[in-house]
């Protein structure tokens, strides 16, 4: 049985979050946590928080199973675009430039490895 966690309205552009999501897609949870902890990207902090939440959701959904991080893997990670806040920045000659402050929604799905020794 799989479990998922969704982090909504993260104040990071979706393009930057997709770079981090690609690092952990398909990896074991313990490897994914190590990658996110050692990543220098600012978005990796939010991704780590969501990954921990997905693991906790798996434990909540399956109370009779005792699984460790090495028995779970990241089944899917996807990033959707959230709301865009539009702001104005003063520009030369009385004009204004539009600044788009983008946000995203991060979804992480974890599942149990079928054969732990082969994955």
UniProtKB/Swiss-Prot annotation:
Keywords (A to Z) from UniProt: Ribonucleoprotein, Ribosomal protein, RNA-binding, rRNA-binding
Function: This protein binds specifically to 23S rRNA; its binding is stimulated by other ribosomal proteins, e.g. L4, L17, and L20. It is important during the early stages of 50S assembly. It makes multiple contacts with different domains of the 23S rRNA in the assembled 50S subunit and ribosome.
PANTHER family attached to this UniProt entry: CHLOROPLAST 50S RIBOSOMAL PROTEIN L22-RELATED (PTHR13501), LARGE RIBOSOMAL SUBUNIT PROTEIN UL22M (PTHR13501:SF8)
GO molecular function, one term: rRNA binding
Subunit structure: Part of the 50S ribosomal subunit.
Family of the protein in this entry: Belongs to the universal ribosomal protein uL22 family.
GO cellular component terms given for this protein: cytosolic large ribosomal subunit
One BP term from GO: translation
Annotated organism of origin: Chlorobium phaeovibrioides (strain DSM 265 / 1930)
Protein name according to UniProt: Large ribosomal subunit protein uL22
Pfam families in the cross-refs: Ribosomal_L22
InterPro entries associated with the record: Ribosomal_uL22 (IPR001063), Ribosomal_uL22_bac/chlpt-type (IPR005727), Ribosomal_uL22_bac/org-type (IPR047867), Ribosomal_uL22_sf (IPR036394)
Disulphide linkage map: none
UniProt cross-references to Gene3D superfamilies, sorted A to Z: Ribosomal protein L22/L17
């Amino acid at each position: 049985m799989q479990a998922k966690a969704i982090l909504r309205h993260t104040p990071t552009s979706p393009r930057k979050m997709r770079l981090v999501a690609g690092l952990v897609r398909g990896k074991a949870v313990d490897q994914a946590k190590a990658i996110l902890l050692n990543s220098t990207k600012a978005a990796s902090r939010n991704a780590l928080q969501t990954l921990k939440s997905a693991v906790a959701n798996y434990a909540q959904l399956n109370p009779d199973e005792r699984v460790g991080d090495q028995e779970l893997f990241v089944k899917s990670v996807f990033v959707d675009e959230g709301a865009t806040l539009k702001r104005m920045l003063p520009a030369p000659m009385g004009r204004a430039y539009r600044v788009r402050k983008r946000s995203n929604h991060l979804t992480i799905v974890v599942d149990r490895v079928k054969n732990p020794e082969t994955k």
